[in-house]
């Protein structure tokens, strides 16, 4: 995966200052035509941003620049290898800073292919026994459900008639577990309804019962600033998982 960062140039405008057509000009491939069944070529309207978002032209330019000095990460002492390794490590720090944990030695950024692989890594590393219990919810993407089913016992928090998480039920299950639930894995925002969970409130509840919180932020990162430290220690997010290709990163 690639995280591209750049400083604003003098000629750049802030996104809030752009008109509708200027927004379109930021992205690559927006005007690429595709064929219909009858052979006619049209410019499609994309509604699949929840799966993959279009890329910025500036990201494309940065990617092309990176290819000029592309080498093996941490595999040599040549200039290209060292340059690529530095870019790789810089990206890690950029991610940590973005979530306000850049100066906290308790956090690190781990690269994987996508959210599903991240969840599988966590499920296989954190869980030591099939009898361990993880608490998740009925609003999860399969990426935050199936990995736990394969590695441990899973319990679910229900949602109400409006699709909102039953916070009281979550706390009740944690309390009744008497410390047996070590991890609570929840979505930051539902990929079906768009409902945004109060992750810091949930984190506080989890820590009250000595459980750690894992947040699937695949559908949240692009739409809301996330401070993993919270406003106080009990609100900290222990693990945050997301995929750059689902979001608009520049």
Give the predicted meaning of each segment.
Residues 1-250:
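Pyridoxal 5′-phosphate
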